[in-house]
Curated annotation (Swiss-Prot):
Keywords: Cytoplasm, Initiation factor, Phosphoprotein, Protein biosynthesis, RNA-binding
GO biological process entries: cap-dependent translational initiation; formation of cytoplasmic translation initiation complex; regulation of translational initiation
The name this protein goes by in its record: Eukaryotic translation initiation factor 3 subunit D-1
Compartment(s) of residence: Cytoplasm
High-level lineage: Eukaryota, Metazoa, Ecdysozoa, Arthropoda, Hexapoda
Stated role: mRNA cap-binding component of the eukaryotic translation initiation factor 3 (eIF-3) complex, which is involved in protein synthesis of a specialized repertoire of mRNAs and, together with other initiation factors, stimulates binding of mRNA and methionyl-tRNAi to the 40S ribosome. The eIF-3 complex specifically targets and initiates translation of a subset of mRNAs involved in cell proliferation. In the eIF-3 complex, eif3d specifically recognizes and binds the 7-methylguanosine cap of a subset of mRNAs.
Length: 563
């Protein structure tokens, strides 16, 4: 009997699977439902396995060895473990200090002192008198007490910041036009400004006495009071600038005004400058009978002088003293006398008449112009204090200034009599910290005038409590451009600040404006003020024969009773 065998039932049939074709990338186009919402983290077969959670991820608290198991994989945080504290077991603990019985107080004091190595007559100044009592020497008590309040100076626990007064009271009818903060001004730059071109020169200069270069601490010399007149004439009262303004330039100022604006980012005290815009011309002036010409002392110090008017070390009294020292020093180091040679410029001193018989300070005035671009031509009056005869016979013009030491302990400085001869760089570095603005302005004035050298004198009080007698301890000279680089003074930035002020005023209508440094913030404000502002202050000033009012001159030798 034959049987028919069905072979089709013994072998399964082959069904062709559906292969997805991904035209836009690599891998499947759709994800099966069984693998949805399952987190995925790239891994490498070289990764360490056998851990419950990924301790090598970014949540690892071991910052020192955070790259211990690092690789290109394992950087995800899908399986990272985050420790969360269980607050159900939180409870308060009594932290009140337990009062010890009297017999246990000071029990471990001697053990602690002996462990730190401060035994009897040890270096730390601890003396043990027995019976568990340890005292400090009186010398070390004084050294320790100032350190007690160091931690209180930080944060809001320290004393409130010192509020300075404004140089001029802002009135209600003044309109604020612009506020310029120091960080923005410090980013300005106006490069490639050429050296100023001389227009005319006036005055007479005396020659420098080289014997003052040999003065040192052991060979000091008393500072003399020179009875000479020093003119501090503002821009619009200068007859030469009035004459030049008719034909040359459209911005007019003095070197002191320009230096104040160009070094404004280094100033802390308040100051102001009046600007008059007449057509396309700008005149920058200082107000009469103000402290604009006084030299600041320790303006940029961490601990500036205290505001005690009754003290000789108040900011104003120190400024008068510094101005007195500066003018007398600049005249004392010159060869004076009728028999001594003098250097005469093209024109005589424009601030004295021929019939006046007065002793005028040795000052040479150089009127120069600069082209600042965009048809802006600056005309300014610059000054030289002396002249030096070189071996080749060519004269070198000097800017002579003086730094003064008043009280090194109160000024947080260094003792000049101990450091000046051996570590003069340390003394100058300390002055750069405490008087950065004043030194920068002196440097800018020397650069603007084209001085060949900047002479700095070191003048100190004979007694720190006596502000009327001083001695010269030494001198030092620099080239203005090199000294500007040394004190990190950028002339490109200085020209940029000046050009920014000029552009702001040029955009305004004709009238009177005022630039003021905020007394407590690093901000300069530009105000639009009425045309008759400050006119009442000038009504009492004397006028010359030609009707041109001059600012009162100052005789610092006769005003010595003020300091």
């Amino acid at each position: 009997m034959s049987e028919t065998i069905n072979t089709a039932a013994q072998f399964p049939s082959f069904e062709k699977p559906t292969v997805q074709f991904n035209e836009k990338g690599w891998g499947p186009c759709e994800l099966p439902d069984t693998f949805k919402d399952v987190p995925y983290q790239p891994f490498s077969k070289n990764d360490r396995l056998g851990k419950i959670c990924d301790w090598t991820s970014t949540s690892n608290n071991d910052k020192k060895y955070q790259n211990k198991y690092a690789s290109t994989f394992g950087t995800g945080n899908q399986y990272a473990y985050y420790h969360e504290e269980d607050e159900t077991t939180f409870h308060l603990v009594d932290t009140a200090r337990v009062q010890k019985p009297p017999h246990q107080r000071g029990r471990f004091r001697n053990m602690r002192n002996s462990r730190s190595g401060r035994g009897r007559n040890a270096r730390g100044g601890l003396n043990t008198h027995g019976h568990g009592m340890t005292t400090l020497n009186s010398k070390n008590v004084k050294a320790r007490d100032p350190r007690r309040g160091v931690g209180k100076r930080f944060g809001n626990r320290g004393p409130p910041p010192k509020m300075r007064e404004s140089s001029v009271a802002v009135r209600a009818d003044w309109a604020s036009i612009e506020e310029m903060d120091f960080p923005r001004l410090m980013k300005l730059s106006l490069p490639n400004i050429k050296e100023g071109e001389d227009i005319t020169t006036c005055g007479t200069l005396e020659y420098y006495d080289k014997t003052y270069d040999r003065i040192n601490v052991k060979n000091e010399k008393p500072l003399q009071k020179i009875d000479r007149i020093v003119h501090t004439v503002t821009t619009t009262d200068d007859p030469v600038i009035r004459r030049l303004s008719k034909t040359i330039g459209n911005v007019f100022a003095t070197d002191a005004i320009l230096a104040t604006i160009m070094c404004s980012t280094r100033s802390n005290y308040s100051w102001d400058i009046v600007i008059e815009k007449v057509g396309e011309k700008i005149f920058m002036d200082k107000r009469d009978h103000t402290e604009f010409d006084l030299l600041t002392v320790n303006e940029t110090s961490v601990e500036p002088p205290t505001d005690d008017d009754s003290s000789c070390n108040s900011p104003r009294n120190l400024a008068i003293e510094a101005t007195f020292i500066n003018h007398n020093f600049s005249q004392q180091v010159l060869k004076t006398g009728d028999q001594e040679a003098k250097y005469k410029f093209e024109e005589p001193n424009p601030f004295i008449s021929e019939d006046e018989d007065i002793q005028v300070a040795s000052v040479g005035y150089r009127y120069k112009k600069w082209e600042l671009g965009s048809d802006i031509v600056l005309v300014a009056r610059c000054e030289h204090d002396g002249v030096l005869q070189t071996p080749s016979g060519e004269p070198q013009f000097l800017s002579i200034k003086a730094l003064n030491e008043w009280d090194s302990k109160l000024a947080n400085g260094v003792e000049w009599r101990q450091k000046l001869d051996t570590q003069r760089g340390a003394v100058l570095a300390n002055e750069l910290r405490n008087n950065a603005c004043k030194l920068a302005k002196w440097t800018v004035q020397a650069v603007l005038a084209g001085s060949d050298q900047l002479k700095l004198g070191y003048v100190s009080r004979i007694n720190p409590r006596d502000h009327s007698r001083h001695v010269i301890l030494g001198t030092q000279q620099f080239k203005p451009h090199e000294f500007a680089t040394q004190i990190n003074l950028s002339m490109d930035n200085a020209w940029g600040i000046l050009r920014c002020i000029i552009d702001l005023v040029m955009k305004q209508k004709d009238g009177k404006y005022l630039i003021m440094k905020d007394p407590n913030k690093p901000i300069i404000r530009l105000y639009d003020i009425p045309d008759n502002t400050f006119d009442s202050d000038d009504s009492d000033d004397g006028e010359g024969d030609d009707g041109e009012g001059f600012q009162q001159v100052y005789n610092y030798a006769n005003n010595s009773n003020k300091i």
